[in-house]
């Protein structure tokens, strides 16, 4: 029995001497890359879901909830629509001569003057909005033979009956309404916008009381255009106590052109003109509050950052905004392929290289070295290969933003009911554009992600090949991203391999001797694992024999009793 115990002990000692890492005349050097416990899934051309160590979201999917007042000049319409402010509704007098980059119309806005309609409302609204100003210049029209500045109880200015401040309601004087024929030249170097209207009485009696004639007519002409409107007399739905209406029209007079107004009744005359400016001002319907902040991009939901190339907040935008796409998320890979580190390394705790898995906890770089030698184990990052990968990835996000950010705004589009088919066509075109952009965005991101992953894999392979060329025949590729170094390689030696100053000639003879020297059981990797497992099994068997022998000896001495009952 003592002989068996002694042999078992000797065998274990010999076996232990041959475990990996105990040979001080060799070392192991592994190359690896950064890994995280939980990576981010991205899409590439070849794979719908591939895990990377880091990724950046490219789609802005939320707003600040408020419209920033900088750097754009925001004009809050409050209770007024832009057209009401243009006409001079009494409760919109505060908007006279105002300027803006973006006019914000609220859902609570209302008209509080004479009931009116604008046959080409959307065009007028868009024209004035893009002009960015309500600057108004009064002109002296000669309205001889009629009474001016008519008012209505439906349009109070304070406690007095009043009317739109930018329009002049003309009606009979001493039961007479002569034919009016007035001209006004444009001697300036800018376009003039004239707003005028036609009154539609609710009854024939109202018509004759105001304009004497049973039917009036209004003709407004320039060298380029002419509009003739015949009033439609008849009752309409009651609004603010009135069943009559005013139709609002507009005429643009170019420099050198002339405005001609001819009427024998029902004319709502202009008091002057608005200056038309060319610019990128706009209008937006929104109930988002206006706050003190800064943002280049504004949507009806509120301002959004424009540091991402895409947004999913709203199709309607103003300013330099990300491109609208349908996707809620598009992630751009800004790190390498993630292969989480295995928590166990087998029975003997060997280190492993990048072919098996990544390394967690590498905070100094993306690529690096781990070693195991006579001085212990260690790890260090390779800053050169890390920087090479980062330099190529860093500008990727900025390049995508430059390709996609719009330097103009997407305005609201309105059409009258008559233009319904045009509206349907326009909507189809817009939807098609969004579909195309959404597809292009997904394709662009997938291509960039594929390039990033290929790039980072390539840097890893470059570092591995660089190390292989340094070590040459002094080491053996273990097939898992590691090298078995066949000479004593302390930490200084390992450092020289990392920084590229390793001289393989210095260690060549020692490495060759160690390669061919037989130490115990030195086997090639094809049979080494088998022998180790067989040796371990024999050791366990011998230990079991020892334990069984002890039990039998104890039974013979009477120290242990064994009763078998049937």
Swiss-Prot record:
<keyword id="KW-1162">Viral penetration into host cytoplasm</keyword>
<keyword id="KW-1164">Virus endocytosis by host</keyword>
<protein>
    <recommendedName>
        <fullName>Hemagglutinin</fullName>
    </recommendedName>
</protein>
<comment type="subunit">
    <text>Homotrimer of disulfide-linked HA1-HA2.</text>
</comment>
<keyword id="KW-0732">Signal</keyword>
<feature type="disulfide bond">
    <location>
        <begin position="68"/>
        <end position="293"/>
    </location>
</feature>
<feature type="glycosylation site" description="N-linked (GlcNAc...) asparagine; by host">
    <location>
        <position position="38"/>
    </location>
</feature>
<feature type="disulfide bond">
    <location>
        <begin position="489"/>
        <end position="493"/>
    </location>
</feature>
<keyword id="KW-0945">Host-virus interaction</keyword>
<keyword id="KW-0449">Lipoprotein</keyword>
<keyword id="KW-1015">Disulfide bond</keyword>
<keyword id="KW-0472">Membrane</keyword>
<keyword id="KW-1161">Viral attachment to host cell</keyword>
<keyword id="KW-1167">Clathrin- and caveolin-independent endocytosis of virus by host</keyword>
<dbReference type="GO" id="GO:0016020">
    <property type="term" value="C:membrane"/>
</dbReference>
<dbReference type="InterPro" id="IPR000149">
    <property type="entry name" value="Hemagglutn_influenz_A"/>
</dbReference>
<dbReference type="GO" id="GO:0075512">
    <property type="term" value="P:clathrin-dependent endocytosis of virus by host cell"/>
</dbReference>
<dbReference type="InterPro" id="IPR001364">
    <property type="entry name" value="Hemagglutn_influenz_A/B"/>
</dbReference>
<feature type="disulfide bond">
    <location>
        <begin position="80"/>
        <end position="92"/>
    </location>
</feature>
<feature type="glycosylation site" description="N-linked (GlcNAc...) asparagine; by host">
    <location>
        <position position="301"/>
    </location>
</feature>
<feature type="glycosylation site" description="N-linked (GlcNAc...) asparagine; by host">
    <location>
        <position position="142"/>
    </location>
</feature>
<feature type="glycosylation site" description="N-linked (GlcNAc...) asparagine; by host">
    <location>
        <position position="79"/>
    </location>
</feature>
<keyword id="KW-0348">Hemagglutinin</keyword>
<dbReference type="GO" id="GO:0019064">
    <property type="term" value="P:fusion of virus membrane with host plasma membrane"/>
</dbReference>
<feature type="signal peptide">
    <location>
        <begin position="1"/>
        <end position="16"/>
    </location>
</feature>
<comment type="similarity">
    <text>Belongs to the influenza viruses hemagglutinin family.</text>
</comment>
<feature type="topological domain" description="Extracellular">
    <location>
        <begin position="17"/>
        <end position="530"/>
    </location>
</feature>
<feature type="site" description="Cleavage; by host">
    <location>
        <begin position="345"/>
        <end position="346"/>
    </location>
</feature>
<keyword id="KW-1165">Clathrin-mediated endocytosis of virus by host</keyword>
<feature type="glycosylation site" description="N-linked (GlcNAc...) asparagine; by host">
    <location>
        <position position="499"/>
    </location>
</feature>
<feature type="disulfide bond" description="Interchain (between HA1 and HA2 chains)">
    <location>
        <begin position="30"/>
        <end position="482"/>
    </location>
</feature>
<dbReference type="GO" id="GO:0046789">
    <property type="term" value="F:host cell surface receptor binding"/>
</dbReference>
<feature type="topological domain" description="Cytoplasmic">
    <location>
        <begin position="552"/>
        <end position="566"/>
    </location>
</feature>
<feature type="lipid moiety-binding region" description="S-palmitoyl cysteine; by host">
    <location>
        <position position="565"/>
    </location>
</feature>
<dbReference type="GO" id="GO:0019062">
    <property type="term" value="P:virion attachment to host cell"/>
</dbReference>
<keyword id="KW-0325">Glycoprotein</keyword>
<dbReference type="GO" id="GO:0055036">
    <property type="term" value="C:virion membrane"/>
</dbReference>
<keyword id="KW-0812">Transmembrane</keyword>
<keyword id="KW-0261">Viral envelope protein</keyword>
<feature type="disulfide bond">
    <location>
        <begin position="113"/>
        <end position="155"/>
    </location>
</feature>
<feature type="lipid moiety-binding region" description="S-palmitoyl cysteine; by host">
    <location>
        <position position="562"/>
    </location>
</feature>
<feature type="glycosylation site" description="N-linked (GlcNAc...) asparagine; by host">
    <location>
        <position position="138"/>
    </location>
</feature>
């Amino acid at each position: 029995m003592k002989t068996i115990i002694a042999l078992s002990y000797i065998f274990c000692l010999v076996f232990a001497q041959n475990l990996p890492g105990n040979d001080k005349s060799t070392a192991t050097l592994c190359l690896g890359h950064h890994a995280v416990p939980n990576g981010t899934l991205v899409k590439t051309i070849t794979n719908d879901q591939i895990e990377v160590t880091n990724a950046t979201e490219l789609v802005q999917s939320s707003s600040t909830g408020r419209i920033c007042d900088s750097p754009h000049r925001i004009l809050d319409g409050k209770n007024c629509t832009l057209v009401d402010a243009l006409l001079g509704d009494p409760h919109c007098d505060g908007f006279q001569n105002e300027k803006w980059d973006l006019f914000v119309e609220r859902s609570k806005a209302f008209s509080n003057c004479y009931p009116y309609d604008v046959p080409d409302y959307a065009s007028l609204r868009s024209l004035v909005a893009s002009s960015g100003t309500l600057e108004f210049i009064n002109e002296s029209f000669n309205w001889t033979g009629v009474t001016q500045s008519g008012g209505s109880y439906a349009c109070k200015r304070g406690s007095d009956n009043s009317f739109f401040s930018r329009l002049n309601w003309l009606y009979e004087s001493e039961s007479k309404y002569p034919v009016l024929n007035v001209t006004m030249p444009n001697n300036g170097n800018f376009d003039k916008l004239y707003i005028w209207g036609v009154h539609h009485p609710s009854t024939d009696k109202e018509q004759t009381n105001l304009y004497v004639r049973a039917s009036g007519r209004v003709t407004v002409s320039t060298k380029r255009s002419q509009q003739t409107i015949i009033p439609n007399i008849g009752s309409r739905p009651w609004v603010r106590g009135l069943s009559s209406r005013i139709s609002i029209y507009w005429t643009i007079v170019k420099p050198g052109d002339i405005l001609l107004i001819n009427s024998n009744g029902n004319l709502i005359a202009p008091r002057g003109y608005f200056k038309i400016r060319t610019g990128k001002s706009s209008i937006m319907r929104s109930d988002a509050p206006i706050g003190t902040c800064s943002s280049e991009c504004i949507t009806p939901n509120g301002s959004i950052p424009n540091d991402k190339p895409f947004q999913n907040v709203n199709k309607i935008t103003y300013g330099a905004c990300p491109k609208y796409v349908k996707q809620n998320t598009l992630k751009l890979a800004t790190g390498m392929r993630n292969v989480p580190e295995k928590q166990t390394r087998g029975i003997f705790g060997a280190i492993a290289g990048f072919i098996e898995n990544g390394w967690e906890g590498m905070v100094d770089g993306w690529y690096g070295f781990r070693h195991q030698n006579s001085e212990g184990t260690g790890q260090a990052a390779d800053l050169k290969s890390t920087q090479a990968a980062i330099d190529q990835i860093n500008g990727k996000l900025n390049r995508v933003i430059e390709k996609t950010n719009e330097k103009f705004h997407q305005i609201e589009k309105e059409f009258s009911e008559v233009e319904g088919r045009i509206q349907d066509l326009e909507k189809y075109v817009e939807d098609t554009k969004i579909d195309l952009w959404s597809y292009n965005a997904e394709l662009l991101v997938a291509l960039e992600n594929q390039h990033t992953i290929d790039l980072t894999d390539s840097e890893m392979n470059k570092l591995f090949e660089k190390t292989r060329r340094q070590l040459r025949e002094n080491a053996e590729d273990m097939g898992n991203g590691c090298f078995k170094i066949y000479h004593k390689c302390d930490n200084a030696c390992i450092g020289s391999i990392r920084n590229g100053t390793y001289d393989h000639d210095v260690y060549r003879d020692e490495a060759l001797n160690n390669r061919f020297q037989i130490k115990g059981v030195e086997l090639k990797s094809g049979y080494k694992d088998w022998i180790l497992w067989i040796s371990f099994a024999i050791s366990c068997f011998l230990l079991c024999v020892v334990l069984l022998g002890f039990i039998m000896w104890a039974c013979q001495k009477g120290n242990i009793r064994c009763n078998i009952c049937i």
